[in-house]
Amino acid sequence: MNSAVEQELAELGIEAYLSQHQHKSMLRFLTCGSVDDGKSTLIGRLLHDSKQIYADQLEAVHADSQRVGTTGERPDLALLVDGLQAEREQGITIDVAYRYFSTQKRKFIISDTPGHEQYTRNMATGASTCDVAVILIDARKGVLDQTRRHSYIANLLGIRHFVVAVNKMDLVDYSQSRFEEIKEEYVTFSKKLNNPNLDISILPLSALEGDNVVNHSAALAWYKGAPLLEVLEDIDIDADRGNGEFRFPVQYVNRPNLDFRGFSGSVSSGEIKVGDDIIALPSGKKSKVARIVTFDGDLPSAQAGQAVTLTLEDEIDISRGDLLVKSTSNLTATDQFKAEIVWMTEKGLQPGRQYDIKIAGKKTVGQIDAIHHQVNINSLETFVTDELPLNGIGLCDVSLTEVVSLDRYQDCADTGGFIFIDRLTNVTVGAGMIQNLSELSDVAPINDNVSAFEVELNALVRKHFPHWGAQDISKLLS
């Protein structure tokens, strides 16, 4: 048993400890930044100094440090996170590693993401479920291309809180002037992200020495702010989750007996109360919320992030993939939209190919109609391309084979984010974030004189010259 848990159990008793732990707020954060900036070491230091490591784990780290460690005689705390053999041999992070710990104020889930450019898809996967991004910068090197890339991806995936940790301050003699120089450089860069809602905290630390990670440090006496752990404990994410209109994607129809029929899932955004008027989409049927059921009993209301079962006053047809919203909701139903897409497979994304698309609990079919541009995620400049490669990020036009109720990703990640699934291999090949939605419109049929040659020529133009913005005339044929 680790010493922190043992101490709390002795003070509170088992029941009080479990009750306190259950009602703590949860914060999900990821560590990201350039290669060798010390991301895994920082997580190891957080776990070590907050007394979250079991005795046998610490013994294993001491033993492994002598074999594959990079810190000399001291234990290599990065080995607490880098568990793959290839990671330990190369001294880098490849896969996304998850670790869990708690303090007296909050529970944490940490995603340790890789820094190398070829693992951009892994980083995007880790960021997609996080509330906060801890972005590490090597005090010797300053802001690098990979720092900019990870900041861009974290911002793209809707993370609103950045904690910029200037690491390895021990290697620059804890220089305040060097810290201020890096701070100014990052603040200047962050303005290019064009996100006025971004909350950025910047602090100095040394993960290797433990300075300003969990406790204040005499070596950084000139820094008057809080250490990293305290900053993470005080970030208010509940306000972010409560914003927005009510969205409830139905994941499961719960019918244990003939007398109960409920709809289970997690509240994606907003709040719902007993008695609220709701609409089930896509059917458009209306009803009222009769009960909000949980394992611990009924609730009068539920907020974003809570997993609940809703029962309705009326028996209406609702199935997995349907969406429950309030009757006053302003939601766009469309089959076309623009989205930022992160491509995750060796075979590049090409316009015109159909994929299974999963949005919240709903599965449909769609395709890329055009690629407007790809983003150089190091410089944030854009350039024209006809194919999106592995780890590429670009703005694309997407069309679906049916009308679906959607949000912009920045308004609701669950109903504004989606994944591409290869229809032959069933492999997830890409992820998308909806930026703009197209209103449904009645299109006049094209003249019957359109030939097969013209349809084929139109397809070639859309494939090789997507920046021209040509529409798919085959869809307009009556």
UniProtKB/Swiss-Prot annotation:
Alphabetized UniProt keyword annotations: ATP-binding, GTP-binding, Nucleotide-binding, Nucleotidyltransferase, Transferase
Gene name of the encoded protein: cysN
Enzyme Commission identifier(s): 2.7.7.4
Ranges where the record places region G1: 33-40
Protein's name in the database: Sulfate adenylyltransferase subunit 1
Region (G4): 167-170
Family the entry assigns: Belongs to the TRAFAC class translation factor GTPase superfamily. Classic translation factor GTPase family. CysN/NodQ subfamily.
UniProt-annotated stretches for the region G5: 206-208
